[in-house]
Every structure is written in C-alpha cells, then in structure tokens.
Amino acid sequence: MGQKINPNGFRLGITTDHVSHWYADSNQPGQRYKDYIREDVKIRELMSKGMDRAGISKVEIERTRDRVRVDIHTARPGIVIGRRGAEADRIRGELEKLTGKQIQLNILEVKNPEIDAQLVAQGVAEQLASRVAFRRAMKKAIQSAQRAGAKGIRIQCAGRLGGAEMSRSEFYREGRVPLHTLRANIDYGFFEAKTTFGRIGVKVWIYKGDLTDKELAAQQAAAPSSRGRNDRRGGGGGERRRRPNDRNDRGGRRERDSAAAPQQNSAAEANNAEGGK
C-alpha cells in the first residue's frame, strides 16, 4: 500500500499536516463544505497561472469568519512580490474578488529548494520542456538533492520519453526511500511537463530522515495516557505475586534445595543405623 498511496496523505497527522485549515458547519450557500473545497481549488489554480517561474512549493489556506489567510511557500519570493509589491497587490485583489472576504497574504521563502519534492519535480519538468534528455535531468536533480542533505531520493518520469512511439516509465533512486515506514519524513511532489510529444509526468519522493525519539515522546505525551495494569486492579504498583514455578525464583530455589540436601542425607543415614541395630 505504501508503494501506491500518496505519501502526504498516508502520513497525515504523523509527519505531515493539512494544507487547508478551516471548519464548515453551515448550510447557507457559499458557506458549505463543498463551497469551501471549490474555493480552495480555485485559489490554488489562480496561484499556478502565470507563476511558472516563481517556484511555488505549496499554498496553505486558513479561514476565519470574515478573513482568509493565504500562505505562499516559494523559492523565489521576489517574483511573487514584484516591484514595490505590485504583483502581491494584484494577487491580493484577485483573491478578494474570488472569495469576497478580506485576504491576508503571506509570502514565505523555501530555505532549501533542492530537497523540496514539489520544486524538484517542477525543475525536472522545466528541463524536459526545454528538450533536455530525461536521464540527464533526473540524475542532475538527484545529485543536487544528495548534496543538500537528502538521505534518499527517487524520481520517476512517465510518458513518451525521448519522443518514443510507446509511452513508458523510468525511475532512478539513490539512498533509502522507506515508503512503508510511517515515522519516515518523506516529501512527495508531482508536476507535468508539456513537451512537443505530449505530457510527461514527473514524480519525486525525498526521504529526509525519521522522527526523533524526542518528537515521538512529545506526541505520546500529547495523547491521552492509559493507566497501567496495577492501576486498573486498584493495586499500588508493587511487585507481582510470585507463583511456585516462577522463572525469576529458580536460582533461589536451587540454593534452598542444595542446602536442604545434606540434612536429608544425614537423616536417612541415622534411620539406616537404627534399623541395623
């Protein structure tokens, strides 16, 4: 299952979080759950149009009663902001027109774009659209990710690779990419390259390491703790009652048996002596 499912959805609540934060319990038109979902899709489509060179990694949306907060994670914040903030003002105006609410626009810079799966997939797709050989583009992205500190990376391209008549898929992998390990921090990205031969899909998995014991302990502390067996029985948590065949008592039993053996032998000799008389 880990080989097929989207890694972000598979690890939701463990290493990943929702990209939309809001709650809908109204039946009024425009405030229903499906309305918010449709609006989120339109917002993300608006961010993707005309922003091919901006390197947008993800868009997070948070809603309140009369305001919508949009966080744009990008590798090139200067392109999104524009000269003197003109581009940011244009985006804010289009979002307010789309949602009809006040927009709080936050533009955040991606510190290490070489190990951001979405940006890596977008970079490989741009090279494929520029007629770069797909194997060369994939290997170059893998080398850049490993130099940036990735513990494992896998890149897959599918489509009419190299202009072939029949479509196929090829992938390259370096390092470990444990897709079944839930505590593994795996970033996933997908992008489509529009070439003269058709569309080529690019998928990227980047393994950044496991959650530390400290992080797991913090999660377990946040979860409701269950009582122990002694608490359920009403005991004070003392030592458990030993049974005759307890393994932990075998050493002491052997010592007691060896100490009692000479006494038994002396008693048997005394009885034999009396019988001989």
UniProtKB/Swiss-Prot annotation:
This is Small ribosomal subunit protein uS3. Binds the lower part of the 30S subunit head. Binds mRNA in the 70S ribosome, positioning it for translation. The lineage of its organism: Bacteria, Bacillati, Actinomycetota, Actinomycetes, Micrococcales. The keyword ATP-binding does not apply. The gene is rpsC. Residues 245-258 have a biased composition (Basic and acidic residues). One of its GO terms (biological process) is translation. NCBIfam families: rpsC_bact. The keyword Ribosomal protein applies. It comes from Kocuria rhizophila (strain ATCC 9341 / DSM 348 / NBRC 103217 / DC2201). Residues 43-111 form the KH type-2 domain. GO terms for molecular function: mRNA binding; rRNA binding; structural constituent of ribosome. InterPro entries: KH_dom, KH_dom-like_a/b, KH_dom_type_2, KH_sf_prok-type, Ribosomal_S3_C_sf, Ribosomal_uS3_bac-typ, Ribosomal_uS3_C, Ribosomal_uS3_CS. Keywords: Ribonucleoprotein, Ribosomal protein, RNA-binding, rRNA-binding.
